[in-house]
Amino acid sequence: MKILAFTGAGISKQSNIPTFMERPDVREKLFRSYANVHHEEYNEVIKQLKANMNGAKPNDGHIALAEYNIPVITMNIDGLHKLAGSEALELHGGLPEDDEMDIAYSLYNKPVLYGDPAPNYQKAYEMVYTLQPEDVFLVVGCSFHTGISVDLREIAKSRGARIIEIQEDAAHNVRKTLEELIGDMK
């Protein structure tokens, strides 16, 4: 049995990072068309996002995935999976480095904006296509509001993989689910 995790904002919510759904004022500015026209305003939005994420620590959901060496596909741009020790495929990139903040509006994949190509989507599709009927697609904190979120679930279903959804209390339920699937590592 192989487990592949797919995570969204719900896993990082318990690390005190608000979701974009909770921040429509931010979400409406994460479009390439906005960044191209409103350079300074866009840069300020990215600075605010970075400030919200600076100091955030991986919660036990992130840590459990890393401890169990579960491959991760994430829609998040917070970098918490990597901080926890996972090799995560970041579908929407990350945030600019501090020395790039003044040119954030011109950067691609830092983060991927609405209207941008998403270079890691193909890799995600390929990862999910490897699932077999004995495998598990563990979906953590992902809504059905993005095309990629729906697509990956549909591919996993078409491959016969078991889909387990954790939409509440990811910080605790990820470890519990992995322990049930794999057993206690200790």
Per-region residue spans from a language model:
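Conserved catalytic alpha/beta core of Sir2/sirtuin-type deacylases, generalized to analogous enzyme cores
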Residues: M1-K186
